[in-house]
């Protein structure tokens, strides 16, 4: 578990990259529950890139953000789960300042018997813009759920959510297989491109 707190001052810019990977001999459960708090002052901006590619058996990833006037936050999350792994991502952003904006994009792939849940809450408390998007590829016997929530407390708050869960299209596989790839190689190529 870890707690990361960012207090980004007026007109300051931060880019934070977080990559999680677990490995070991399989005798213990690899659990990672990071919490990230972001407090953006007037005109501040932050890009948060969070990637979890493999090896984490169980994770609860929480991101909480408050945005002041003209602050901007961009979150890019990429998650791959396999086996019986479980990944939960929770995002809450309070857009408190006029002109603030938040863009959350999560791209995930769930394989085997793994499970994933994505939840995002955008609270538009001022004239602001917010967008949350979750795109997931589901394979094998995996389970994926997405629950975006938008709350506007200002008539000039513009909030959008998008969620898509689906399998790899057969025609995509066929096209790559006609180029000489095996079905497994074609799947790997598609997953790699999706998470890029």
Residues covered by each model-derived region:
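Conserved beta-strand/loop scaffold segments within soluble protein domains that form the structured core
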Residues: 1-181, 191-196
